[in-house]
């Protein structure tokens, strides 16, 4: 079942999109009037931002300080799991050269060592 917050967001977007017909905008207005234009639900984006903030705090608690190369770039610190996943994917991707796989393995080991 579609997320109610996404449905509301879609109708709001339709109202502000100059490429949407007046007929479609009227349907969007009607839907928002009947169902409310505000929602107590959160969209995936909001959940993602909260998760990023939680992850950053958790990384700091685990000892990731300014000495860590990933802490210098806050977005990388927040997404350490994505960084690790990228290295793992490169190690198992048949289109990546052997040299690239070795390099990914070295970087993954470095990341794992720094997270201890």
Curated annotation (Swiss-Prot):
Residue span of region Disordered: 32-116
Disulphide connectivity of cysteines: none
Keywords, sorted A to Z: Cytoplasm, Nucleus
InterPro entries, alphabetized: Conidiation-specific_6, UPF0654_domain
Top-rank taxon: Eukaryota
Localization of this protein: Cytoplasm; Nucleus
Gene Ontology cellular component list: cytoplasm; cytosol; nucleus
Signal peptide stretch: none
Pfam families tied to this protein: Con-6
Biased composition range(s): Polar residues: 39-48
Biased composition (Basic and acidic residues): 49-64
Family: Belongs to the UPF0654 (con-6) family.
Protein's name according to its UniProt entry: UPF0654 protein C869.09
Annotated source species: Schizosaccharomyces pombe (strain 972 / ATCC 24843) (Fission yeast)
